[in-house]
């Protein structure tokens, strides 16, 4: 009956919806020929638990806390969690500025309104000070005034802003239910119902409908629907069906989530997306009694956060769509004030408090404490009052292992220690969404990959030493290319179907991508050896038969990168090394990446080739120019942007077999000699 109610609640949406780019929109609209009969989500809607606990019927608040639990939280705020709560109160955004007036269509404006509602409402329920209640009302009124939740030309009412506002207004309505007038409750409830209907109709199962379960544009809006469903569960007949739909979709979201804790979209998207996974799991557990946390990707998530962080604590190993690369690292660019407000890295590290609490993980708590010492900041500090377990014994970061291998995504991280002066590096050679995805695609035929935030970067590496990011990635791009990474080009071409839009992996068989892998990891006291095979990362039209890279680090001696490359037809092969600032030519065939007072010395050579004549290394130093992300709905249509420089090292003539060798060593920038290590 509830499934029928959802179907009857359908509202026709505008046809002119825009996705991230044209190809992604077409994939979203296309019906899958693999799906026959009833959509798989309907069975999940019937069988998965989504009923509100009987004791919560007719009760407010209930989504995340009850009145009894609020009493306990008020005591925490004055005792064990006093410092955390003071920090949260100092950052209540609804007290610092008015909400944007309608239509509030600037990027992320409505997202902030949603978070501000929840923050101010919760602060009021803990403090009892009416200034927080008045601020929450003001922001809720603003949300009601927005006719469209989101962007009018890009999935209006059904995308990220809708998820944020349903979450904020849903929980705000639930928390403040008894503090609002009858007229206010009616007005807020009617707006919530209207917006939830729009979103539920968009996400409901339809014949042939596919879902990008692992992509944030699915689980962020659907989290908002789930929160609204539990807030309104017994106040509108459609709400139970919304809860069913959300639980069904989340069944697949969790099943397709990372097996090893690594987040494929990149650390910027871990920061942005992970709160919504936690918000749904917490709301669902509190509302229904069902705990969905116990999955390897959540147990291991703190490893991804810890090892992604650079020793400096102000940036990360930035595989995937992450900020603006060299610009952000230099404190420049349009994104820096958002990513580093007042110079503090915004990481949402307090999410690890929740994982530490749930899994009783002293390691996760230790990672969070380490990030806090760097002065990092969170979007929702107020959650720390609920999440932080003051009784949990912390494992300090210094006692945790300083390297980690993520076997499902085939990404490796190593550092000499946990100090700011550590030498650290990372190496990546795996399929965009992990090895488990190939089997899952067979199991879930309605799962549609949307891997645009992952990059064509197999067999690439990032190096950090002496407090400097020496070489690595380019950051978030509208059109990701292999040339943005420290990897290989074949006749100037890179991996997968790069250059055709934001998703370089669209329409590439995952069976081919799944052969991309790290084949050896050896960590010894005297050396670290990583071998990666990226042969099938490249399209068959390029004729690449073999691309195996060995990446070796020996403390005191530096790095050695050895590449074995074979092709079916002669091709010019090019290695790329990136610099945030500049690349300099030291001597004939010798180069350096300069990073302030430090430089990375580069000595390349070709050891063997199919050409009987000696093969020279041809070099070029170029500005690294890319397509920056465009506006919502046209991410691949951004402006051209310069981010650092790149060194291109090529065979002097087409060849079918080559062994490249690069020796990399770190020295002070004022040293004039070239290392022979």
How would you name each of these model-derived features?
Residues 2-14:
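Bacterial N-terminal signal peptides
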Residues 13-21:
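Bacterial Sec-dependent signal peptides at the C-terminal "C-region" and cleavage site
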Residues 20-84:
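Mature N-terminal, pre-catalytic/accessory segment of carbohydrate-active enzymes
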Residues 35-56, 157-160, 187-217, 454-458, ...:
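Short, charged N-terminal helix-start/capping segments
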Residues 42, 47, 269, 274-677:
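Extended polysaccharide-engagement surfaces of secreted carbohydrate-active enzymes
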Residues 62-73, 77-78, 82-89, 93, ...:
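Aromatic-lined, polymer-binding surfaces characteristic
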């Amino acid at each position: 009956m509830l499934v029928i109610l959802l179907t009857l609640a359908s509202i026709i949406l505008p046809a002119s919806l825009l996705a991230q780019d044209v190809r992604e929109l077409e994939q979203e609209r296309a019906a899958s020929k693999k799906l026959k009969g009833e959509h798989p989500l309907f069975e999940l809607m019937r069988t998965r638990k989504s009923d509100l606990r009987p004791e919560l019927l007719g009760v407010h608040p209930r989504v995340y806390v009850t009145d009894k639990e609020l009493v306990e939280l008020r005591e925490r705020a004055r005792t064990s969690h006093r410092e955390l709560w003071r920090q949260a109160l100092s950052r209540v955004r609804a007290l610092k500025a008015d909400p944007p007036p309608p239509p509030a269509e600037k990027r992320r404006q409505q997202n902030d309104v949603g978070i501000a509602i929840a923050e101010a409402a919760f602060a009021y329920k803990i403090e009892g000070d009416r200034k927080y209640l008045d601020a929450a009302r003001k922001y809720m009124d603003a949300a009601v005034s927005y006719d469209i939740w989101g962007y009018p030309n890009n999935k209006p009412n059904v995308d990220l802003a809708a998820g944020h506002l349903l979450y904020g207004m849903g929980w705000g309505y639930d928390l403040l239910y008894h503090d609002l007038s009858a007229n206010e409750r009616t007005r807020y409830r009617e707006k919530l119902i209207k917006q939830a209907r729009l979103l539920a109709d968009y996400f409901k199962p339809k014949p042939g409908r596919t879902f990008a379960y692992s992509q944030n544009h699915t689980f962020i809006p659907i989290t908002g629907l789930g929160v609204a469903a539990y807030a309104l569960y017994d106040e509108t007949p459609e709400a139970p069906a919304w809860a069913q739909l959300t639980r069904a979709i989340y069944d697949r979201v969790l099943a397709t989530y990372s097996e090893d804790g690594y987040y494929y979209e990149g650390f910027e998207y871990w920061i942005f997306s992970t709160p919504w996974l936690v918000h749904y799991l917490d709301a669902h557990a509190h509302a229904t009694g069902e705990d969905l946390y116990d999955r390897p990707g959540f147990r291991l998530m703190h490893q991804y956060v810890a090892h992604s962080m650079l020793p400096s604590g102000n940036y990360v190993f930035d595989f995937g769509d992450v900020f603006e690369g060299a610009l952000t690292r230099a404190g420049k660019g349009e994104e820096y004030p958002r990513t580093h407000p007042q110079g503090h890295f915004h990481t949402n590290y307090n999410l690890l408090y929740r994982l530490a609490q749930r899994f009783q993980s002293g390691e996760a708590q230790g990672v969070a404490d380490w990030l806090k010492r760097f002065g990092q900041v969170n979007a929702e500090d107020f959650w720390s009052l609920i999440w932080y377990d003051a009784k949990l014994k912390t494992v300090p970061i210094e006692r945790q292992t300083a390297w980690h291998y993520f076997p499902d995504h085939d990404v490796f991280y190593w550092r000499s220690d946990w100090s700011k002066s550590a030498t650290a590096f990372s190496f990546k050679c795996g399929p965009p969404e992990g090895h488990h995805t190939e089997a899952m695609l067979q199991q879930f035929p309605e799962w549609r990959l949307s891997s645009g935030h992952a990059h064509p970067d197999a067999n690439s590496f990032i190096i950090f030493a002496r407090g400097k990011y020496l070489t690595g990635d380019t950051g978030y791009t509208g059109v990701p290319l292999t040339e943005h990474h420290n990897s290989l080009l074949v006749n100037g071409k890179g991996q997968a179907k790069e250059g055709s839009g934001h998703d370089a992996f669209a329409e590439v068989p995952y069976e081919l991508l799944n052969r991309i892998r790290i084949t050896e990891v050896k960590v010894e006291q005297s050396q670290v050896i990583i071998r990666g095979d990226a042969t099938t990362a490249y399209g068959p039209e390029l004729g690449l038969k073999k691309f195996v890279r060995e990446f070796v680090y020996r403390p005191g001696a530096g790095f050695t990168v050895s590449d074995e490359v074979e092709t079916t037809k002669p091709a010019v092969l090019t290695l790329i090394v990136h610099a945030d600032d500049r690349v300099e030519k030291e001597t004939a065939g010798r180069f350096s990446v300069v990073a302030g007072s430090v430089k990375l010395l580069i000595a390349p050579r070709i050891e063997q080739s199919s050409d009987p004549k000696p093969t020279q290394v041809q070099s070029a130093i170029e500005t690294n120019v890319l397509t920056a992300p465009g506006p919502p709905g046209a991410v691949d249509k951004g402006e051209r942007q310069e981010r650092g420089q790149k060194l291109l090292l090529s065979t002097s003539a087409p060849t079918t077999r080559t062994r490249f060798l690069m020796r990399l060593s770190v020295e002070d920038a004022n040293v004039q000699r070239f290392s022979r290590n």
